[in-house]
Amino acid sequence: GYTRTFIYGGDSHFDNMTHYFSHNGFDIVDRRKSYRLKEDLPTHRTRIEDDQVSFENAWAVCDADVYNTLLKVVDAQHKSKQPFFNFVMTTSNHKPYTYPHGVVDIPSGKNREGAVKYADKTFEDFFRKAITKPWFKNTVFVIMADHCAYSAGRTELNIKNHHIPAYIFNLKNERPTEVNKLSSQIDIFPTLFGYLNWSYTSNIFGKDISKMTRKEERAFIGNHRKVGLLKNNQFLVLETNKTHSFYDWNEHENTLTNTETDSLFLTETISYYQAAFELFKNGGLKIPNKVVVKRTH
């Protein structure tokens, strides 16, 4: 199978990522600033050492350092002739928006635009290096935001603030295509597997966007306290204390209007989130001991 590695420029104990990725079969490469007396992980964890860091803020090392680490990891994986899946997380597009001096024409720490410009420049530098590597032609790149700039919070769910970009790049025999369908992050892997023409068995909730019908389009939106389902320009939000709100959504004006709850819509929304929770809680999302993935070409 594929060797799996999570690469992060900060300490992966943040948001419990160390436990999550290691218990899902990923080795971890991170800054590892915190040392516990005992860390019993089922996989291997490697620290990004000081001599590999050119710039660092409270979040993590800069994107360029993360990508340089990634290149070294992939070179070693390719040399071992082992197929690889690497999950990489960068942080430069976060406050305080600091990054190495002189890389872009907006001073470090000034604003989000500077951080975005720096993140974009490091993308370019990474791909200029990656394209020279022997593994590039057989490697697919997925670029996706974990959230947009203004999606944090504990109260209101602004739908437009949860619109993020996603790209699948370097697919063989595929023409550039723009897909405008209502979908979510969970759909990226089924979509990728569809483009790769893989036959597989899975219990994941996502769908192949390229084959998704208008009737199947939906998005899952949430923050620290609320979760919701958006479908057919209707939006149901599950709130604390078993309460909920139901809205009609005007996509063009991005406005929500309270309306009478559709009981079937409410049941569907609860079912999605409760089923996912129960499966996760009871180990139902774990990979069985024997899983066969057939690649067809």
Regions from the language model: what does each represent?
Residues 1-297:
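Solvent-exposed soluble domains appended to multi-pass membrane proteins
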